[in-house]
């Protein structure tokens, strides 16, 4: 029968239907081609917002730089980046006054972090700008390449493995007159294959040394590479995001550690917590404002939107904030933290891949790299691109755009939140000194503002005062996109509040379904997602049961593992039918082996192997989970794995699921074609690097109280640890005397090899 969809909504309160309007089903839009245009947009817009600032020239790189700080006060509602330093410092002082000891304690915590953080922090993260090759690489590889170049230039402080020592090398590298780097290049030649006697193209990878002058090196060290942000829903236009190189990353990490420590102590901050914890924090602020308003006051909430948050922020303001926050701290600590904002004040934006041209008549395609845009004839470009290039040309140095104002997406989320909260903090009556007062929530660029006042005029005055105060620190609340409502109904970071948070279930839709890792992980992740949504997102029992049935169906179609007694023919059905017939206890077969589904909403927390273990035939158990079976994954069995799930909004979330190693937890092999390209050496480096890190983790698991600090190399640290562990094991009788002697012998051999290697 046909169902009229409007009937579905008859008994549903309007706020619960909000999620159906979200663009979250189906595939998200991806960008194709080059991000160069989007990057030029960002650079040009950022300069436009600060155009009344002062121009200077960087003495080292020759880059023209625009400084809008303490610029003219805005006279209209247009977005602008003219933050006033004294206003920012005053906001910081009031924030500290309302939270005694806030900055002091956070500095102490961060100092400990700075001294203990190891370099492997920088191997996290995916694509990173690799300044040695001038393109993006996985983080671990980019770090390895940087260290290799540092070492060949006599910078070796990083060998201690401490991040702070690596940063000392970075500082020293910037004073060097020149840096020698190794670049990779490809040679192609045609040779005859001995076996087939056909001509084939043989590629050889060459490495060549290249010297960078101080100027060129500094430009690369200060460069952010840009890409297009993918999979953004609900937007017509794509936008550019940036990835910084290894020189900047470590410094940013420490600044964010300090800011995170501050945010954790601020009740108005939506970072760094998430999920239910965040909702609880928000609900508290709302409750406070509503209880205080009671009968005498009105309470209104603005669901806020800021215009181009990043492009109006300024690194110089962050420098002022850090200078104030750390004012009573040791000199070395203040210096380490002030470097990130200084580097960002001098940053350069790499314009991405450039443009692709094709001539229909001659069937020719050619790539114009971004570096050529400075002096190419503009007649080849269309009107809008021509305008962009003309605007950006004065800013280009060695093919890279100088971008002093603005912050680029996601670099200082925590610190910019501190700035936002400091303005919310000024809403207390003791600061407004009038009848209206405000409070609110801030999470990076998203905010909700709650204003209380005796009458509507007071509310209006309060919002106006907030708006103007924000302008003084370079925050531009958008009057077009923000809206105001009686307190009790608002939206903040995609959480919808209506006398309590409404579950926005559509946000979770993209994470339902089969992940495509392997049969074992996919089953586990699928049921965990359903379980988590029953806990956190009002997924009711009937809907959950339906979701489960749909998931199992989807899973069977993905892996072609329909039940052994089904009529559906797939390329696996012959084997699965055979297995079905041979099996005595058919209920014990896993779904991926053609077995029945035993999951229901009551047992989603049990891994499938555990659920069916007692029902399995003995020989099936033996094949499925036998570590000697070559098809059982040989990764160590950790009871919990992490999967990356894609919610519809915000970054990919890490989700824990139970992992049982069976013949179904295979790991797909890398695509072979990479092994024949210039990436091959890089791939091998990456694997070696990964192996070394894993080995180190084995010696110093995170559970051991502290990682070694101040020992001269990873190798020495591991050898000394091995000796200590061996002695403990020997004295407690866990290992025999011969084994103990052998371990000591191996340790000495390793040390000897290490000495020869030096």
Swiss-Prot record:
UniProt motif (Nuclear localization signal) ranges: 187-195, 203-216
Location of the RdRp catalytic domain: 286-483
Name of the protein in its database record: RNA-directed RNA polymerase catalytic subunit
Cell compartments where the protein resides: Host nucleus; Host cytoplasm
Role summary: RNA-dependent RNA polymerase which is responsible for replication and transcription of virus RNA segments. The transcription of viral mRNAs occurs by a unique mechanism called cap-snatching. 5' methylated caps of cellular mRNAs are cleaved after 10-13 nucleotides by PA. In turn, these short capped RNAs are used as primers by PB1 for transcription of viral mRNAs. During virus replication, PB1 initiates RNA synthesis and copy vRNA into complementary RNA (cRNA) which in turn serves as a template for the production of more vRNAs.
GO molecular function: nucleotide binding; RNA binding; RNA-directed RNA polymerase activity
Chain intervals for the UniProt region annotation (Disordered): 53-82
Post-translational modification: Phosphorylated by host PRKCA.
Gene3D superfamilies: 6.10.140.720
Region spans: Promoter-binding site: 249-256
Assigned protein family: Belongs to the influenza viruses polymerase PB1 family.
Compositionally biased tracts (Polar residues): 55-64
Subunit record text: Influenza RNA polymerase is composed of three subunits: PB1, PB2 and PA. Interacts (via N-terminus) with PA (via C-terminus). Interacts (via C-terminus) with PB2 (via N-terminus); this interaction is essential for transcription initiation.
InterPro entries: RNA-dir_pol_NSvirus (IPR007099), RNA_pol_PB1_influenza (IPR001407)
GO cellular component labels: host cell cytoplasm; host cell nucleus
Any single biological process term in GO: viral RNA genome replication
Organism, scientific name: Influenza A virus (strain A/Hong Kong/156/1997 H5N1 genotype Gs/Gd)
Pfam (any one): Flu_PB1
